Amino acid sequence: MIHLIASDIDGTLLQGGQTRLDPALFDVIERLEQHGIRFAAASGRQYTNLRRLFAPVADKIDYICENGSLVISDGSVLYKR
């Protein structure tokens, strides 16, 4: 069973200079949550930048940010370097 889906942002969910995520992605994240599957945004970007980018679902996803030096789940820091 799948418990977590993680995705890179730049060059994957955002392509060709896009600055906003496709709103359909937020619906997908909501549906994943309904099935007990977590979504994690993985990026070199800073945490605050990712929260703004994922604003509609910001409190429902996990973050692997700052090139892996900060990991946050359910608002708690799991790893910081």
Model-found features: residue ranges?
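A structure-centric signal for secondary-structure junctions around beta-strands
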Residues: 1-2, 8, 60, 66
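Asp-based phosphoryl-transfer active-site loop
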Residues: 2-18
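Conserved strand-to-helix beginnings and helix N-cap segments that scaffold or border functional pockets
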Residues: 18-19, 51
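Active-site phosphate-binding/coordination module
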Residues: 25-81
